[in-house]
């Protein structure tokens, strides 16, 4: 007898360890687990820990050649989800040795790569991860971060303004550049390639880059402000992506852009390193995120994708608007906005933050609010997101009845009015509409915008009751 007992044994005998004291170096995960009928939660939780670390479906002879206690994931705590039948939050601790340094790709392949198709589970969602400082320190993180970006742009004390150029597909490069110029001239800080603008037959990437750069330099000369356009470098191969970023750098632009989920974490991390080495800011779009994060009980919550982006690298990331959505979503959106910007985030279950997360000086990421917002939302956005954010008005700029430049003027005037009012100690939540109305007396462009998008009622009371 060699001490090897073949056969299948329950996962919970090895991987469910409720007495385990987590280590400071462990990666901790919170999963929302819905077991199949008849599968006890301990077995389901242990199965998740096993299949995402050292386990397989049967005992194997080679288990004896390693120290499983050192390398196995452990399910160390299970709590039922209030108000849900047969749903549990399962906490799993992974030893740091299971992960390659500086690789978001490897971290995800290990933690979520295999276990989601597991038969014993009906559905599974990764709600949060605690990344230990020992692992955070193996990542470069965002190319520059919030403070360096402000210094590069010479813009302080207010949110930054952006606009996605529409129609997103079909414009020629020259007309696209015209639209960029009008927006920047009117007072925006940035314009943006749509996420699916890459290099299509009607507008090849190189032509677009050249005409957009012409627009940037012309607008800078006229306004005396630094301007940028998020040149989307996303491409079919990593080499082509870097080639586009290199060309952007040669043109002297301040910022490029990447779709980090469709482009992939490996490509994104490479681009992020290139951007830091070459002084480019990196704007990140989250195209495809809803495929992964939309279902409440299956997939990966966006806060995990946001943490992963901060590790992989990006200076801006789209993070929803909060305005007009349900209150619970508001708190949760604020939760991952804080995770993106701050250096140390306390556990706060009301915001969906399952673990205290120290970032040990990893640069922060600016959250980008974009999607269906216009001048009447400005007070709410200023109040909710604060100065360190990018507010992006696509239709809210280009839909102005007088054209792009007046649309940009309207947004800039509204923003400056809100920032001034806030600095004077006024209550943006209560007086928001009044502030915008008053400012529109001095700005015909803003008055016209206010007329088009008529006052909206802010669902804004809940902010104070967090």
Curated annotation (Swiss-Prot):
Keywords: Calvin cycle, Carbon dioxide fixation, Chloroplast, Lyase, Magnesium, Metal-binding, Methylation, Monooxygenase, Oxidoreductase, Photorespiration, Photosynthesis, Plastid. SUPFAM superfamilies: RuBisCo, C-terminal domain, RuBisCO, large subunit, small (N-terminal) domain. It catalyses: 2 (2R)-3-phosphoglycerate + 2 H(+) = D-ribulose 1,5-bisphosphate + CO2 + H2O; D-ribulose 1,5-bisphosphate + O2 = 2-phosphoglycolate + (2R)-3-phosphoglycerate + 2 H(+). The modification N6-carboxylysine is found at residue 192. GO terms for molecular function: magnesium ion binding; monooxygenase activity; ribulose-bisphosphate carboxylase activity. One of its GO terms (cellular component) is chloroplast. Its main location: plastid. It is found in: Plastid, Chloroplast. The modification N6,N6,N6-trimethyllysine is found at residue 5. The active site is at 166 (proton acceptor), 285 (proton acceptor). GO terms for biological process: photorespiration; reductive pentose-phosphate cycle. Binds 1 Mg(2+) ion per subunit. Substrate binds at residues 114, 164, 168, 286, 318, 370. It comes from the Eukaryota. The record marks 325 as: Transition state stabilizer. Mg(2+) binds at residues 192, 194-195. The basic functional RuBisCO is composed of a large chain homodimer in a 'head-to-tail' conformation. In form I RuBisCO this homodimer is arranged in a barrel-like tetramer with the small subunits forming a tetrameric 'cap' on each end of the 'barrel'. Heterohexadecamer of 8 large chains and 8 small chains. RuBisCO catalyzes two reactions: the carboxylation of D-ribulose 1,5-bisphosphate, the primary event in carbon dioxide fixation, as well as the oxidative fragmentation of the pentose substrate in the photorespiration process. Both reactions occur simultaneously and in competition at the same active site. NCBIfam families: PRK04208.1. HAMAP family: RuBisCO_L_type1. This is Ribulose bisphosphate carboxylase large chain. It comes from Drosera regia. The gene is rbcL.
């Amino acid at each position: 007898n060699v001490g090897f007992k073949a056969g299948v044994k329950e996962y919970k005998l090895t991987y469910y360890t409720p007495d385990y004291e987590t280590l400071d170096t462990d990666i901790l995960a919170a999963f929302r687990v819905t077991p199949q009928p008849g599968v006890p939660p301990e077995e389901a939780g242990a199965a998740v820990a096993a299949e995402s670390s050292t386990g397989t479906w049967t005992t194997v002879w080679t288990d004896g050649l390693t120290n499983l206690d050192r390398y196995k994931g452990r399910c160390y705590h299970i709590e039922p989800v209030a108000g849900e039948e047969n749903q549990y939050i399962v906490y799993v601790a992974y030893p740091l040795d299971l992960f390659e340094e500086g690789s978001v790709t490897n971290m995800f392949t290990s933690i979520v790569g295999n276990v989601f198709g597991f038969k014993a589970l009906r559905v599974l969602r990764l709600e949060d991860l605690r990344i230990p400082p020992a692992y955070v320190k193996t990542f470069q993180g965002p190319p520059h971060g919030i403070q360096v970006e402000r210094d590069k742009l010479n813009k302080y004390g207010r949110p930054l303004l952006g606009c996605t150029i529409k129609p997103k597909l079909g414009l020629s490069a020259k007309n696209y550049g015209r639209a960029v110029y009008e927006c920047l001239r009117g007072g925006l800080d940035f314009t943006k390639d749509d996420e699916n603008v890459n290099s299509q037959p009607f507008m090849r990437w190189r032509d677009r880059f050249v005409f957009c750069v012409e627009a940037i330099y012309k607008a800078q000369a006229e306004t005396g402000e630094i301007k940028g356009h998020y040149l989307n470098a996303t491409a079919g191969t990593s080499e082509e992506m870097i080639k586009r970023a290199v060309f952007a750098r040669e043109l002297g632009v301040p910022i490029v852009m990447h779709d980090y989920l469709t482009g992939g974490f490996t490509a994104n991390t490479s681009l992020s390193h290139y951007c830091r080495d070459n002084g480019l800011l990196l704007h990140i779009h989250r195209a495809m995120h809803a495929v992964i994060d939309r279902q409440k009980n299956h997939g990966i919550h966006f806060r995990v994708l946001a943490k992963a982006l901060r590790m992989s690298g990006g200076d801006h990331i789209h993070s929803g608007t909060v305005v007009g959505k349900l209150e619970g979503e508001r708190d949760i959106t604020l939760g991952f906005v804080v995770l993106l910007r701050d250096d140390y985030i306390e556990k706060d279950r009301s915001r969906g933050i399952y673990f205290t997360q120290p970032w040990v000086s990893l640069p922060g990421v600016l959250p980008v609010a974009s999607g269906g917002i216009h001048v009447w939302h400005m007070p709410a956005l200023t109040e909710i997101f604060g100065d360190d954010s990018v507010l992006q008005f696509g239709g809210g700029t280009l839909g102005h009845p007088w054209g792009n430049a007046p649309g940009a003027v309207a947004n800039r005037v509204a923003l400056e009015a809100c920032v001034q009012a806030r600095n004077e100690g006024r209550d943006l939540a209560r007086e928001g509409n009044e502030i915008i109305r008053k400012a529109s007396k001095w700005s015909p462009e803003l008055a016209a915008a206010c007329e088009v998008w008529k006052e909206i009622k802010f669902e804004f009371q809940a902010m104070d009751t967090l």
